[in-house]
Amino acid sequence: MSLVYLMATNLLFMLIVLFTLSHRQLRKVAGYVALIAPIVTSTYFIMKIPDVIRNKFIAVRLPWMPSIDINLDLRLDGLSLMFGLIISLIGVGVFFYATQYLSHSTDNLPRFFIYLLLFMFSMIGIVIANNTILMYVFWELTSISSFLLISYWYNNGESQLGAIQSFMITVFGGLALLTGFIILYIITGTNTITDILNQRNAISRHPLFIPMILMLLLGAFTKSAQFPFHIWLPKAMAAPTPVSAYLHSATMVKAGIFLLFRFTPLLGLSNVYIYTVTFVGLITMLFGSLTALRQYDLKGILAYSTISQLGMIMTMVGLGGGYAQHTSDELSKFYILVLFAGLFHLMNHAVFKCALFMGVGIIDHESGTRDIRLLNGMRKVFPKMHIVMLLAALSMAGVPFLNGFLSKEMFLDSLTKANELDQYGFVLTFVIISIGVIASILTFTYALYMIKETFWGNYNIEKFKRKQIHEPWLFSLPAVILMLLIPVIFFVPNVFGNFVILPATRSVSGIGAEVDAFVPHISQWHGVNLPLILSIVVIIIGLILALVVNWKEVTHQIIKSASITDGYRKIYREFELYSARGIRALMNNKLNYYIMITLFIFVAIVVYGYLTVGFPHVHQLHISSFGPLEVILSVVTLIIGISLIFIRQRLTMVVLNGMIGFAVTLYFIAMKAPDLALTQLVVETITTILFIVSFSRLPNIPRVKANLKKETFKIIVSLVMALTVVSLIFVAQQADGMPSIAKFYEDAYELTGGKNIVNAILGDFRALDTMFEGLVLIIAGLGIYTLLNYKDRRGQDERE
């Protein structure tokens, strides 16, 4: 149950932070209260490392909807532990960083940290979920919390657009993911992930296997910003920098990669998956690195560099996916190398990219700009950030003695050995190596170019609006700690490899500790080999391009992503246009139209049921006895109902409508139901009086002549509805297997204290229902009151 307590603890801290909204002084400490949550979470995951290394996994299952195998099923294994450590440890740094970044006087700190806690809660939920539907719930919660965080500064138009764009794309991917999970349930009859993976061979032979893969890939590609779904990530940079450092570099964008790692033993059985993931990753890596060179905004550069690095990791996920169909120890060694490298670089990327984002946030916060055309010579005012960002950028570029070099060399090693696989021949291997090397060169180029344009050169304070620029120590502390980790990981990589990455590799492989024989030992020196030569080539060419070429003059010649973004905007505008037309057609403020739509849907559902199940055989028909009074009432009601269709005087219509109600009252009397008759009489009288009184408040709308076609259609709808209700009565009469409720009538007085069965039912069963109905009316009344008292934001006095 420890996983349940962990999730409950995070929810508890959300409630505590929510409580700080109640007092102005408490709001200032909301961030420090929220900081306790990632500290507790990271402590929990660190304490579980020894158990996971010994393959002692934690599993919890609480029934939710067991009939369809939807349960609160949580599991902590090596993969979820690694991601949990990244989420929580990076979270500690980001939460503390945010307390220094946000204003304690103007920003709503509790609201921000509630959103951030909700996101961390959702991400942890994704990585420990062992049920596909539960994973989907957490998956969409990350999209919702991301939307709230991106739009935190909601008065900023860019924040609004970025939030909507990211939400639209990631939710679209989430729906595709849900479709894939439903297909898996259709094939296997279970939503439990471990059970699904145990049936992988049977699933791979099913005709829905490929459609399921494509749906899961859509979910992963949209979440992890893969081409062409990458366009939401640069727009999301409108969020506060702590959000960018946490969600859009270290955690949320890794959710899609986590999904593919989790299902690798199943998805890797298809070559469609292997080719698609590998080449989408390579294209994304190349496109992201090339587009980063045409950015002037530091966060824009980091956004596209994140896209590129995610593409690099995705490439390794695709190449290593073939392990699911391996046939020899040599191939197993290669596949495990690639998967291990992907996990290793994922960890390295979280460290150096988060440090870069924090550095950019400090520069922006203190200088008031992120434009590299203005940020020259900043090493003089930001000496600590100069060192932090230089080391982090060089690590991203793959320079020796930094952690990024190790995983980058493993990546190049994976590319050079691709020709050993059945899926790749010489030509494809050459293409893969070429794209990987070119993208790596461009990565080195924009990394060093960013540092050169920001920190080197001549410092001119006149370019900045703020003349007092300084570098607060507490503000810089999280970035400095992350920077120190970069060389530490390089010199003691196997500490992280054995305690974090090895257990994760076991989980990804699907065979547990048996994979240990193939897991590589991370070495800083492998001798002179092809990957080392390629690394040297990348560094030399990257240095030349970064230091010699004036990218400010040639960026307009580089490919632009505007066409894809413009395509999204065009689709979104068309979507809004057609949505507006549809809403105007559907919501036309005509009550009778709404009623007809409701009745039509009801009839359609009933007819669909008859077509699917079939109309039951009529073996018994109960018709109540009736006399002259019932006949007269029926005829009168029919005549009045037909008259209402053609009469246009409002007062006459209300009176006739009331007469129908009073006729129903007489029906109840004839059927010997005096309580119902009295209730109907009171309700009908009050309703009729209120209707007439309300005329004094209604506008004087001119009378409209009856349209014969429309009125005929109304008559048809009414007749069809009447036939539907009668048919349902026939169906109800044929049911003879229902349990008797006569016993309740006998005990009604003793149990409820009511002498009348109707009163007993209303008092015993409808009390709670009536209470909530009253609550709904109160909420509706508050909404109406708000609308009536709403003033136009432009300062006009007229009410909406």
From Swiss-Prot:
Positions of disulphide bridges: none
- Known InterPro entries for this protein? CPA3_Na-H_Antiporter_A (IPR050616), MrpA_C/MbhD (IPR025383), MrpA_C/MbhE (IPR046806), ND/Mrp_TM (IPR001750), Proton_antipo_N (IPR001516)
The record's similarity note reads: Belongs to the CPA3 antiporters (TC 2.A.63) subunit A family.
Chief location: membrane
Q: Describe, as the record does, how this protein assembles with itself and its partners.
A: May form a heterooligomeric complex that consists of seven subunits: mnhA2, mnhB2, mnhC2, mnhD2, mnhE2, mnhF2 and mnhG2.
| GO BP of this protein | monoatomic ion transport
**Organism per entry:** Staphylococcus epidermidis (strain ATCC 12228 / FDA PCI 1200)
Query: What sections of the protein cross the membrane?
Result: 1-21, 29-49, 78-98, 109-129, 133-153, 167-187, 209-229, 241-261, 272-292, 300-320, 336-356, 387-407, 424-444, 472-492, 528-548, 595-615, 627-647, 651-671, 676-696, 712-732, 768-788
Which cellular component, as a GO term, is one annotated location?
plasma membrane
Pfam families listed in its UniProt record: MbhD, MbhE, Proton_antipo_M, Proton_antipo_N
* Protein's UniProt name: Putative antiporter subunit mnhA2
What is the name of the gene encoding this protein? mnhA2
Localization per Swiss-Prot or TrEMBL: Cell membrane
A GO term, aspect molecular function: antiporter activity
Keyword Transcription regulation recorded: no
Q: How does it sit in the membrane?
A: Multi-pass membrane protein
Q: Does the keyword Hydrolase apply?
A: no
Q: Which UniProt keywords apply?
A: Antiport, Cell membrane, Ion transport, Membrane, Transmembrane, Transmembrane helix, Transport
